[in-house]
Amino acid sequence: MTASTDLRFLVVDDFSTMRRIVRGLLKEIGCNNVDEAEDGAVALHMLKGGRFDFVVSDINMPNMTGFDLLKAIKADDQLRHLPVLMVTAEARKEDIVLAAQSGAAGYIVKPFTKATLEEKVTKIMQKLAATA
């Protein structure tokens, strides 16, 4: 996945182990510029203060959930273009529907494989390139 090597990713999860796993998987598929945030509030602060190209966010987090982060991103003129891939341990249909309705670029359920993450990231990036 060479197209994303220059992109800057933000991984948002309240569990540091999960952040490290996702970061490692992203690096394995060629995404070498990856930062981490422990919740939605920290992520939003980082997004407003820096240049990011892609967000991978857990849903269930303290302080600011992944859904609240997604809504804040989509409500911000400077950030709304960012693709957000939602990641969760729960595969509830209502969460999948809410993610899509709220503007998420995709949704995956933990645990997932490197191949699943690569497929989702690649599809999202191809979709963005086609609309650019």
Residue ranges of predicted features:
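Two-component/phosphorelay signaling modules centered on CheY-like receiver
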Residues: 16-35
